[in-house]
Regions:
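Substrate-binding/catalytic cleft of secreted carbohydrate-active enzymes
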Residues: 107, 116-322
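Secreted/periplasmic carbohydrate-active enzymes, especially glycoside hydrolases
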Residues: 1-131, 135-139, 167, 182-183, ...
Length: 322
């Protein structure tokens, strides 16, 4: 037992009461991916000497800081995030959360040299978060894959307008006591991030998150090319480049060669600037070409590679380290 406290409360019949208390630890063991030390908290409600209910939870103690010079710091030490995106990948297991399976998954990722995970593109389950707490993985928890513009039939865009506040609150309250959570992502490859509509929704989401949790940072996983699909004719015209009519494989090959140019084009930079400025950390999907550009043109901007091609890992990791 490292610390304890009793608190007296008077509660009227048929009424509700919220309260808080503080406990102090001298020289606590700090949580990090390298040393995932967890404390166990037991809260018991007594009426007289009779135990009415008891809850138990684990938590970790650590600090976070962020700036363009030192990047992300955990417990005052700079951390380079090397991670992956977890999509629904349980195969035959389906959507059920099996603790042993999740523990195995996290341990395999740790043994592969990863220190971070991003939930793609929905909020992470409590069971997976507990595994990340236990074995030491930093987590980017993601809110949604769509806002108002749909990507497929009957996706979240159908419900977003009425559901976003409740869903964001559920995510943040679920995550709050997990030391592995370092970033909230408000979206993945949202088409609106290249439009004036982006700020309207992003500000709502950011304000809601910060009303519930001011201890974590906020990002948005932006794919600059997908954010500017409506501007591609203007961009390609300025480059005096056209994508000729070929079979689909040749077209995709040519388009991939153009993506770095599109991602760093002044039209693209201007279109995503408002979305980028609203968050603490800009998330870039498949936009490693912007890393050096952002350091030069936006020296106060902090960014993270939220999705990159696995085949480019050596090159992108070299950019991170350098």
């Amino acid at each position: 037992l490292v610390t304890s406290r009793k608190q007296k409360l008077n509660l009227k019949s048929q009424s509700n009461l919220s309260t808080s208390t503080r406990l102090y630890l001298n020289h606590p063991n700090l949580w990090s991916a390298d040393s995932p030390y967890l404390y166990h908290c037991v809260t018991t409600l007594l009426v007289g000497n009779e135990k009415i209910t008891m809850t138990q939870s684990n938590f970790g103690i650590r600090t976070l800081s962020l700036d363009p010079v030192n990047g992300l710091q955990v417990n005052n030490k700079t951390v380079k995030l090397k991670g992956g995106c977890i999509h629904p990948d349980n195969g035959l297991l389906g959507a059920v959360n099996i603790v042993d399976d999740l523990n195995r998954k996290v341990q395999l990722l740790k043994s592969a040299g990863y220190n971070a995970l991003r939930s793609a593109h929905n909020s992470m389950s409590p069971e997976l978060l507990e595994a990340c707490d236990r074995y030491g993985l930093y987590v980017i928890d993601e809110f949604a894959d769509t806002w108002t513009q749909s990507k497929t039939y009957f996706d979240y865009s159908v419900f977003m307008d009425n559901q976003w506040a409740d869903d964001l609150q559920s995510m943040v309250l679920k995550d709050y006591n997990h030391p592995s959570i370092i970033l909230y992502s408000i979206g993945n490859e949202i088409p609106e991030t290249g439009t004036n509509e982006s700020a309207f929704w992003a500000i709502k989401f950011i304000d809601k998150i910060r009303s519930l949790d001011q201890t974590r940072y906020i990002t948005n996983a932006i794919n600059p090319t997908l954010s500017n699909m409506d501007k591609l004719p203007q961009i390609t015209e300025s480059l005096k480049t056209e994508i000729p009519e070929k079979n689909i494989n040749d077209i995709m090959h040519d388009f991939k060669k153009l993506m770095p140019v599109i991602n760093t084009h002044p039209i693209t930079s201007e279109a995503i600037s408002e979305s980028a400025d609203l968050v603490d950390v800009v998330g870039y999907n498949y936009a490693a070409a912007r890393y050096e550009l952002d350091h030069k043109d936006y020296p106060n901007r902090v960014f993270i590679g939220t999705e990159t091609n696995p085949r480019d890992l050596d090159n992108t990791w070299k950019q991170v380290v350098d």
